[in-house]
């Protein structure tokens, strides 16, 4: 009986030690989980993205490229954002691998980022967008016949820091929406109709009829030539592509209710960062390209 008692005691102690060790390992946290990604770009066109991983402890993560791409190069920033640039005239599929590490040095399994490099239909490459994260977005707008920048001295320039007018942005939103245009429209119904270019009136009239377009600062005038603000752009795009209304994202009470809802809707489907809508600054072409390229992908995948 004594031997049995000693054996049982030893067993209990062993179990306690195991439980203690397990509890300690759990308290120290577990390895992050890195996500696989897929991207598209065109030959000789850079594309940006962000590495993503989940840390069970909610701590900060560091990212490391563990497998280099074959057909291009990667520039990785500390926050996980990156720019992939394909080598000259390369096409097809490429990939690279990465791992995420937490503050304790725990490493995730290797995740992969797959890049599909396609041949463009047009010969449009922007000299002022080379190597930028939003170069692909700018070229995509031209490929889809939404917007093409200026050609100066035989080279295309996108002008990523230029402002976008209300009329230009609304017209692009309507093109992406796929709504039939009132091409024969001669009047838009806005007080400043005479200031709206003739080529734009079909877009503005259709948008007004569909509830996409509203007046500018003074309501009755559309103000087509006025630069569009980021919050106005969010509202126009949300209405144009009929994004699902979400209720699980808290609305910013500092914004008008319809703008706050538009920002939440577009944020939920990855079209824009909802923080953009809180900014009263004017929308730039670079920001426009990122928003509209995401909207194109969203509408095409419906």
Identify the residue ranges that each predicted region occupies:
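Short glycine/proline-centered coil/turn motifs in the loop regions
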Residues: 56-59, 68-70
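Feature responds to low-complexity, polar/acidic, surface-exposed segments characteristic
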Residues: 16-19, 23-28, 37-42, 114-135, ...
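Extracellular interdomain linkers/hinges and stalk-like, low-complexity segments
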Residues: 26-57, 63, 96-121
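Low-complexity "stalk/linker" and mucin-like segments enriched in Ser/Thr/Pro/Ala/Gly
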Residues: 66-79, 150
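Positively charged n-region of N-terminal signal peptides that target proteins for export
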Residues: 1-12
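Alpha-helix C-terminal capping/helix-coil junction sites
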Residues: 142-143, 204, 208-209, 267
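Surface-exposed, short loops/turns at beta-strand junctions within beta-sandwich domains
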Residues: 88-92
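Short strand-edge motifs at loop-to-beta-strand transitions and within beta-strands
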Residues: 80-84
């Amino acid at each position: 009986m004594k031997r049995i008692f000693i054996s049982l005691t030893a067993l209990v102690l062993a179990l306690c030690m195991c439980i203690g060790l397990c509890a300690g390992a759990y308290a120290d946290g577990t390895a992050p989980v890195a996500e696989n990604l897929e991207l598209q770009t065109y030959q000789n066109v850079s594309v940006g993205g962000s590495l993503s991983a989940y840390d069970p402890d909610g701590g900060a993560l560091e990212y490391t490229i563990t497998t280099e791409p074959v057909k291009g190069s990667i520039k990785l920033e500390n926050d996980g954002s990156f720019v992939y640039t394909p080598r000259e005239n390369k096409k097809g599929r490429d990939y690279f691998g990465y791992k995420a590490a937490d503050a304790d040095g725990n490493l995730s399994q290797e995740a992969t980022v797959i890049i599909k490099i396609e041949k463009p239909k047009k010969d449009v490459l922007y000299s002022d967008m080379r190597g930028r994260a939003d170069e692909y977005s700018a070229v995509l707008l031209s490929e889809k016949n939404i917007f093409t920048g200026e050609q100066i001295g035989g080279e295309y320039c996108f002008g990523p820091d230029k402002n976008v007018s209300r009329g230009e942005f609304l017209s692009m939103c309507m093109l992406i929406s796929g709504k039939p245009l009132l091409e024969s429209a001669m009047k838009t119904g806005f007080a400043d109709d005479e200031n709206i270019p003739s080529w734009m009136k079909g877009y503005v009239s259709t948008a007004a009829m569909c509830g996409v377009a509203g007046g500018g600062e003074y309501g009755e005038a559309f103000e087509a030539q006025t630069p569009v603000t980021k919050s106005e752009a969010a509202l126009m795009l949300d209405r144009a592509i009929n994004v699902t209304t979400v209720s699980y994202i808290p609305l910013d009470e500092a914004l008008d209710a319809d703008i706050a809802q538009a920002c939440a809707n577009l944020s939920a489907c990855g079209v824009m960062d909802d923080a953009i809508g809180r900014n009263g600054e004017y929308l730039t072409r670079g920001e426009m390209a990122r928003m509209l390229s995401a909207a194109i992908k969203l509408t095409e995948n419906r």
